[in-house]
């Protein structure tokens, strides 16, 4: 039996976190959710197979205020882990910057979020074969 893939979702929006965990926790995936980048980074020793990362975070006590900072730290610590970025809006310059840095995919949080994420997750794991 093949080991389940470990996916991290990092988003300060509890609705999005819950939606993704409920949809993708399955026979194939184990999904762990985090509200802050710090929580995710503290758990990188579990070596997730994929990280789904929000672009914009809110909160006064956060060390990391946006997904770019968290992404850079993930790349520094675990460069082999693919990252899918989520955002509430399409920003061309942000998409280009993340593409240059090596993000696997950039998905807008819209009505097609779950469908688009499902396709992207399959693409990530199909490239491992």
Predicted regions: what is each one?
Residues 32-50, 54-59:
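Acidic, metal-coordinating helix/loop segments flanking the phosphotransfer/catalytic sites
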Residues 11:
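Conserved acidic carboxylate
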């Amino acid at each position: 039996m093949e080991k389940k893939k470990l996916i991290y979702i990092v988003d300060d929006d509890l609705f999005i976190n819950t939606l993704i965990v409920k949809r993708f926790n399955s026979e194939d995936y184990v999904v762990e959710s985090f509200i802050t980048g710090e929580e995710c980074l503290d758990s990188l020793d579990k070596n997730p197979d994929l990280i789904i990362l929000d672009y914009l975070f809110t909160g006064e006590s956060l060390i990391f205020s946006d997904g770019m900072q968290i992404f850079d730290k993930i790349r520094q610590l675990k460069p082999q882990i693919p990252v899918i970025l989520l955002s509430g809006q399409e920003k061309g310059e942000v998409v280009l910057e993340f593409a240059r840095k090596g993000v696997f995919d950039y998905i807008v949080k819209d009505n097609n979020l779950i469908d688009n994420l499902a396709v992207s997750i399959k693409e990530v794991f199909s490239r491992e074969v």
